[in-house]
């Protein structure tokens, strides 16, 4: 069966044949060459035919033969379609200067400017059209969207509110919610989105936006409820599942997040979803599950090797963990993290000399670049624990040279000075600055207590130690310090309790701690 397009072409060719006359008759002087239509109207018909077929170049060639506003506008339209805006604008300007098809030209020019990102010119043209056609709701909606793009949210709201009741309130309200968000008027945005859902209960984007607004307002339960409502309508709505899982992560509901991410894995083979699940499983201590999830990936990235090493390490499969980490060099983007994990594994294996060598090698690599301060923190701590306190102080001092406000380095130096009862005023200043930056860090709280104790201010020290124990009840040093402070206040029984707890928590209790216990027991 012939198509409509084929029939049109046959008609056009028939007209051409009739116009051309008999083949054996030579053309008259001044007539067009064979194969070229003699009538502008016929040329226009053929040009439109080629345009409808998407034969842009052929259509342009034919339109170019016609010096007429219709052909100018057609060429502008095609140049817009094939993304040649400058050529399109040449014809549009010609139309506007000739005062023909001005409205159509302005509308097309508006779209060209919008595509180019020339929003102000697009707004100017659209405002002219709106003034001419105030009842055209599509133009006014377009203008409102343009104003949102240029952050004229109040102007957009005025236009949109004037459009309510025009027949498409759901989209007007949805766009109005964006203008409200732009003005940081969250209650306004929430109200508009609720009205959208009332009008269009299956309009998914409104649920997603409403959930996000609830989150911005700190209304986590309401956000969860909205996302779940959407999933009741569209159980496989990926964006809603992602939003719900992210909400659970932000509220530390990791198991609930895992459930949602597992649903995502059933809907999508995207490896990033698998990696997200791995991180959640590691967070929740589900190391066997994390191991199984990682190894399901067809292609392993550098990050995957690192996560796999963590899973192995947590399962006490230390040799396998170390083998994975050997694939990650210091020069790679995970060089810092891998070095720290290698050092931790070596320490767990009792290979302390190798652990120290690993940290020293990483420090030598990163410190000239002022990178990976975490290696410096760990190295300083291990040097201090190994009785090489001065070397540890030297590392911390270099960290402070790079960043004088580094809270970890400030705390390290301040604590060492407090422990040695030297430079106490300066130590107090350093620890105070560290605590200002990290007010809930139990180690810094302990350091503040210790410097206050050294300054003979045990009552104040006790306040900080209580906070430190609330934050971290498993650190032996904090409990030993609590015992020292309580003992200085004459509370021997409570002091003994903390000394005993410190001894139980210590892998190798110091002789000094045992002496404190024995003195109180005796």
Language-model regions, residue ranges each:
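Hydrophobic helical h-region of N-terminal Sec-dependent signal peptides
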Residues: 9-15
